[in-house]
């Protein structure tokens, strides 16, 4: 076969009329009907709309992804919005309803609104005769505002929003005041942050009972039953003599110190605050007195450590009233809520026992603070157990032991064994679950028994330090049962009337596990403070100071109001004694006025 030439190949190509490919003209009729080969909803004149949101920038989620997977430029995708009409917002019918709450200025608890309870400290004791905790706050006869200084002061801010700037997350959003004014003559010796406190650990054996004082009534089991709707019991105010004397003014502790039964002395309410220090938010202070080789953990009169805080650990804790709202004497400020909760706890422990002289448990000795010749009110059900704990280590040359005055509120018969069980009575209070500072709490009236676990879990979150202190006090006293009462306001806008919605019982050790409370960590904190105070004395001796057995040194441990640190200050030996004398004089004047009015 002869080879093909280029001319033969070109001549074999089809002619120009029969060129390869689709025909150039396209028909615009389909069965005689004209049509346009595009959708009316598509935007003409552009290849793509780059201003529209793509599928990647629209809302996430599988349903949204499946619904919006196709882009807007897909053929026919714009038909849905072809005839859409943009309706303008009609604001002619818009109106604002004034729903601001105004609290009516009401008379506070006791005389003048500022009294918690009439101070009934130890009378005729060896040292300071008065030491009752239920006394008049610093506000005196002026009203409830006196207790507010122990908590965050945010007056003047109002409802204005904040502008957050650089590193605002690391700054305290609420400036609170210290529980005690730091004086210029005080010298700071040590500063310990909470991260260091939380790492301390000291395994301590169970304590031993040294002596018991007082008596106990039996707990009323009817409060354990779920109340029928609209039949809740009203919390009553009972006039009973109750005492919360500081450590150094306790005559029993003074006697034990003279016998050298231990080297460290404290009360359960003071010690529980120290053991749960890393959970606290508000400021508090503890006075430490070193008398020779003895250490006393004391508290000031009218100190914040005696008040029961409310929602201290909530993410949005209760706020102080602004300058405009302060005129209405708001009842939901931290100080007012703490005063209300303290009174509720006092009355709840008195009301939930059956007062019967024929059915009560007498301890070995009578109440050491009650004087029948001076008191006109009957004595409240209270048992004081003085217990000793060993905090010694193997390296210690001398044993380190602490004596703690613990408290029991009632006694309960065991249903199986019939033995008497010691009971600790405490009360949680609800002020308004819709108000600011409620911490997302549920409505107790409708959810307490249907969602008990959720209610208790919320309280553990909002009142972590308060529940931890109560549990620590129950464990220190070796209580068998801890009863938690749930008390709410009869009217959310009034703090004068309360209803008991129910009572739930727990074993203290089990409740401590639920809230991750480690007693070994608490004992480690106590031992650290004891070693720190002893080391300061040793340092003074090395510097040449005269060491006298009867020399008194005083320190104060203060929790910073805005930071998670505690500071130890050295203060003069006569610090706070002038305040005690002034308070005693004011109390005498008040009692004389009451007699004149009668």
UniProtKB/Swiss-Prot annotation:
Q: Where is the composition biased (Gly residues)?
A: 109-132
Which GO terms are recorded in the biological process aspect for this UniProt protein?
Answer: cap-dependent translational initiation; formation of cytoplasmic translation initiation complex
Bridged cysteine pairs (disulfide): none
Acidic residues: bias regions: 589-598
Q: Does the keyword RNA-binding apply?
A: yes
Which of UniProt's keywords are assigned here?
Answer: Cytoplasm, Initiation factor, Protein biosynthesis, RNA-binding
Q: Where is this region: Disordered?
A: 104-178, 574-598
- Listed Basic and acidic residues bias regions: 165-177
- Subcellular locations according to the entry: Cytoplasm
**Gene Ontology cellular-component annotations:** eukaryotic 43S preinitiation complex; eukaryotic 48S preinitiation complex; eukaryotic translation initiation factor 3 complex
Residue span of region RNA gate:
304-318
Q: Is the keyword Transmembrane in the record?
A: no
GO MF annotations for this entry?
A: mRNA cap binding; translation initiation factor activity
Tell me the function of this protein. mRNA cap-binding component of the eukaryotic translation initiation factor 3 (eIF-3) complex, which is involved in protein synthesis of a specialized repertoire of mRNAs and, together with other initiation factors, stimulates binding of mRNA and methionyl-tRNAi to the 40S ribosome. The eIF-3 complex specifically targets and initiates translation of a subset of mRNAs involved in cell proliferation. In the eIF-3 complex, eif3d specifically recognizes and binds the 7-methylguanosine cap of a subset of mRNAs.
Assembly with partners or alone? Component of the eukaryotic translation initiation factor 3 (eIF-3) complex.
- Regarding domains, what does the record say? The RNA gate region regulates mRNA cap recognition to prevent promiscuous mRNA-binding before assembly of eif3d into the full eukaryotic translation initiation factor 3 (eIF-3) complex.
Q: Which family does it belong to?
A: Belongs to the eIF-3 subunit D family.
What protein am I looking at?
Eukaryotic translation initiation factor 3 subunit D
């Amino acid at each position: 076969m002869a080879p093909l030439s280029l001319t033969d190949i070109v001549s074999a190509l089809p002619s120009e009329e029969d060129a390869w490919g689709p025909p150039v003209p396209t028909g615009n009729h389909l069965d005689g009907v004209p049509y346009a080969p595009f959708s009316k909803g598509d935007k003409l004149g552009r290849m793509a709309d780059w201003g529209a949101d793509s599928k990647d920038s629209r809302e996430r989620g599988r349903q949204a992804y499946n619904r919006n997977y196709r882009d807007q430029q897909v053929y026919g995708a714009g038909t849905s919005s072809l005839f859409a009409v943009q309706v303008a917002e009609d604001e002619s019918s818009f109106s604002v309803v004034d729903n601001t709450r105004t609290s009516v200025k009401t008379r506070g608890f006791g005389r003048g609104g500022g009294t918690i309870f009439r101070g009934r400290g130890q009378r005729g004791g060896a040292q300071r005769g008065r030491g009752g905790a239920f006394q008049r706050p610093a506000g005196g006869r002026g009203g409830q505002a006196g207790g507010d200084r122990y908590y965050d002061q945010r007056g003047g801010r109002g409802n204005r929003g904040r502008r957050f700037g650089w590193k605002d997350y690391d700054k305290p959003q609420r400036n609170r005041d210290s529980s005690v004014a730091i004086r210029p003559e005080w010298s700071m010796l040590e500063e310990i942050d909470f991260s260091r406190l939380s790492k301390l650990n000291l395994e301590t054996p169970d304590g031993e009972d040294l002596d018991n004082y007082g008596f106990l009534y039996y707990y009323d089991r009817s409060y354990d039953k779920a109340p029928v709707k609209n039949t809740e019991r009203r919390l009553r105010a009972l006039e009973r003599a109750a005492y919360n004397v500081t450590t150094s003014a306790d005559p029993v502790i003074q006697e034990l110190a003279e016998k050298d039964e231990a080297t460290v002395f404290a009360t359960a309410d003071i010690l529980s605050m120290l053991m749960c220090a890393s959970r606290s938010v508000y400021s508090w202070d503890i006075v430490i007195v070193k008398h020779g080789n003895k250490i006393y953990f004391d508290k000031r009169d009218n100190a914040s450590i005696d008040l029961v805080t409310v929602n201290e650990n909530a993410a949005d804790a209760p706020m102080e009233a602004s300058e405009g709202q302060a005129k209405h004497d708001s009842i939901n400020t931290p100080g007012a809520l703490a005063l209300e909760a303290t009174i509720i706890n006092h009355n709840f422990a008195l009301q939930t026992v059956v007062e019967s002289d024929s059915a009560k448990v007498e301890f070995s000795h009578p109440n050491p603070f009650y004087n029948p010749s001076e008191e006109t009110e009957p004595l409240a059900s209270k048992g004081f157990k003085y217990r000793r704990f060993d905090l010694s280590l193997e390296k210690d040359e001398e044993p380190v032991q602490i004596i703690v005055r613990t408290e029991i509120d009632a006694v309960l018969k065991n249903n199986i064994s019939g033995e008497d069980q010691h009971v600790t009575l405490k009360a949680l209070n609800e002020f308004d679950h819709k108000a600011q500072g409620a911490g997302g709490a549920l409505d107790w009236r409708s959810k307490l028994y249907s969602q008990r676990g959720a209610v208790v879990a919320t309280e553990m979150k909002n009142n972590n330090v308060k529940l931890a202190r109560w549990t620590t006090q129950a464990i220190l006293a070796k209580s068998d049962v801890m009863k938690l009462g749930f008390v709410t306001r009869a009217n959310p806008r009034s703090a004068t009337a309360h209803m008991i919605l129910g009572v739930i019982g727990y074993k203290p050790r089990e409740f401590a596990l639920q809230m991750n409370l480690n007693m070994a960590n608490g004992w480690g904190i106590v031992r650290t403070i004891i070693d720190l105070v002893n080391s300061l004395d040793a340092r003074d001796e090395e510097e040449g100071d005269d060491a006298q057995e009867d020399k008194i040194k005083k320190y104060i441990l203060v929790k910073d109001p805005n930071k998670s640190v505690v500071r130890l200050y050295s203060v003069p030996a006569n610090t706070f004694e002038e305040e005690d004398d002034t308070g005693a004089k004011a109390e005498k004047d008040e009692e004389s006025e009451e007699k004149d009015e009668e």
